Amino acid sequence: MKQFDYIRAGANSDVTGTPDATIIAGGTNLLDLMKLEVMTPDRLVDISRLDLKQITPTRDGGLRIGALVTNSDLAADMTVRSDYAALSSALLAGASGQLRNKATTGGNLLQRTRCYYFYDTDQPCNKRDPGSGCSAMEGANRLHAILGVTDKCIASHPSDMAVAMQMLGAEVEIEAADGVTRTVPLSDFYLIPTDPAVETVLQPGELITAVILPAPAEGRQTYRKVRDRASYAFAMVSVAARIKVTDGKITQAAIACGGIGSMPWRDPAVEEALIGQEPAREVFGKAADILVAEATPKEGNAFKVPLARRTLIATLTELTGVQQ
């Protein structure tokens, strides 16, 4: 690990006023990257003591989650468990208990890909070293994305939490250097990797202060994760979904997927294919076909196309009670 300057922030302005600094909160991802010298910041700003640790109701019946709320505390919150069950399940499906105790809401959104080549400084990687190439294109790509990829990068986004938040229609609250706060829909927060080194709309000196969840929506919701082992493994495919059935027909649908996209993946066309339909495996299959219609798999991750179809169908079957 290379030498760096360390600053402990006492106010948000200590962060937004130092745009050249790297932010550290729980450090569960950043410290690994620093030890491997994938990231070599000259200056760290520790935000762990900022007043961003509250979960509070919003005026419209939603929830404001401070950026420093830990994954463990968020998963255990009674309102989250009752009204945003898919989010609680997604959080508990990620990492380990020890990591969830340290990992924060803002840090989870900003965690870096687990692409092997991003972590190997001897290999070309456009995320780590722009313009050097993407080793995963012709190399080991089993974990990689099949949607939202470019000829510059096929890395998948690793977060479980962000997939559930994408399905729930979350917004990210961001504070700039001038103290002005803006909110960005999570659906607009992440960027397709045309420039793989730029992953989000965050500008230098900006700080995530909270995530805003809308008022709870009607219907049943769940989070399903398919992975190599039962715990402490990233998703090959995951689905966060909410479905409402009224008078025998689907009237509301919200679906986001993980493990298959360069970002938490939500395709409105998949949801639209379900609205007005009677729940049935044939209907779910057509929606699943839409999900993977534009997939561009590589040799190592081609299995994700049928796996994504099956996972979505199984999730919708569970939520609607359709007989197998």
What are these regions (language model features)?
Residues 1-324:
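C-terminal structural segment of proteins
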